[in-house]
Amino acid sequence: KTVRRQRQMCIRDRSSGLIATLIWGLAQMRTSLSAIVSRHFGSDHLDKIKSLIPQTFLMTLILGSIIGALLIFYFDVVAIFLFGDIEEHTFNYAKDYFKIRAIGLPISLLIALFFGVFRGFQNTSWAMYISLIGGVINIFLDVILIHGFGDSIKPMGVEGAAWASLTAQLVML
């Protein structure tokens, strides 16, 4: 049982690493948008960028959805590239976790973009509070969904960790 749990954690960590790399790589739009919003906010010329924020949100949503869908569809190829030859049950844990987390890719990118807009408007408090709320929800749901809760919620293991993260992201959005 301990070995199985360690394998699940290893796969979760590797899959999380790939998802995090994609999110932070693609979230550089946030940095650009933050700088542009900040410059125009400081010079009181927000009218010049009123269409930029919705356009960036739409582009992020489309790009994140396409990449998320491709990752779900081509998971087997990505997994073999990243993990090499792995045991079937370990592969299945990774697949379950990764596919759920890939659904959240566009959500993660939108959250990062919102944080960039907040920073551009010199309002870092909102991003901090939203992050704290998301983190607390994720931790709470991790415990419940991974280990279960009485007879009402059965333990979900690594899949529960993925659902906890996705749920926290939805609340943050």
Regions found by a protein language model. Name each.
Residues 33, 74-75, 114, 141-142:
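Hydrophobic/aromatic residues in alpha-helical transmembrane segments
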Residues 12-69, 108-127:
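Small-residue-rich hydrophobic transmembrane alpha-helices
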Residues 37-104, 151-173:
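Short alpha-helical transmembrane segments in multi-pass integral membrane proteins
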